[in-house]
A protein has these predicted regions:
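Conserved small/polar residues in nucleotide/adenosyl-binding loops
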Residues: 246-247
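Transmembrane-embedded, aromatic-rich helix segments that form part
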Residues: 34-46, 80, 84, 158-164
Length: 247
């Protein structure tokens, strides 16, 4: 698919191939996480197509920068979005059930509705390109609702998330030679990619539906958002040391 994009990279609607790639990436997460290792190669193809460098030294530095960006994207998907959606959904569930006294699964429903509404609003703002402030606020809210910046657990995840969101805000405001480094088209494409990645990743809902039927084989019994988090963390497989000590 990235080679298909390369053939049409100069066309106005070439970004649709990137959006399709992210949808396939979301689906591949449900098959095996090693599929995410395709992302560095995809980023390199994108860089070489968009930023050809005649100077070999500049090309080397650009390739290293592209690899660093690909690692950041890989970490954002693997350690941010994949566990982050479940983590933020769990926070909503605890808030609505333990604090507000609502029935079970109320927080999850509210979270899903707010997540969809935030993504739609952010995509609309980046498409219309009328207010930079609203664009950036909607973009940050979308990233936060997807749980991408919240690495770790407890209050440490919240603090790390605040720092990451502040850094993203600075990047969104950064200008080079009087022009924004992150244009509205980049934000719009990024939001569409995150939305399609979420749609592909939602195939994990089948796990919860299957577990609710109580089949004979039901490891970790992921019937709610908290046990689903344990299931996604592969806690059902236990741990085994890489080096066994002889006794």
């Amino acid at each position: 698919l990235i080679l298909k994009w390369e053939d049409h990279a100069d066309e106005p609607h070439s970004d649709r191939w990137l959006v399709l790639i992210m949808y396939m990436t979301g689906l591949s997460i449900g098959v095996h996480l090693l599929n995410l290792l395709c992302l560095p190669a995809i980023v390199l193809v994108y860089y070489y197509r968009k930023c050809p460098q005649p100077d070999s030294r500049k090309d080397l530095y650009g390739s290293i920068a592209a690899l660093v960006i690909s690692v950041v994207i890989l970490g954002a998907v693997l350690y941010g979005l994949v566990p982050g959606i479940v983590r933020v959904g769990g926070w909503f569930e605890l808030l609505f059930v333990n604090v507000f006294g609502c029935p079970f699964n109320t927080g999850e429903i509210v979270y899903i509705i707010l997540l969809i509404a935030t993504l739609v609003w952010a995509i609309y703002e980046s498409y219309k390109d009328q207010s930079l402030k609203r664009q950036n606020i909607a973009f940050l809210l979308s990233v936060a609702m997807l749980g991408i910046p919240f690495f770790g657990y407890g209050w440490s995840a919240v603090l790390i998330g605040i720092v990451v969101l502040a850094l993203i805000w600075l990047v969104l405001q950064y200008k080079r030679q009087g022009k924004l480094l992150i244009t509205s088209r980049i934000k719009n494409t990024s939001l569409l990619c995150m939305m399609m990645l979420l749609i592909g990743y939602s195939s994990y809902a089948v796990i919860v539906i299957r577990s609710a039927a109580n089949p004979p084989m039901d490891q970790n019994s992921p019937e709610d958002i908290f046990t689903l988090g344990d299931y996604l963390a592969r806690d059902q497989y236990g741990q085994r040391p890489l080096r066994s000590e002889e006794r």
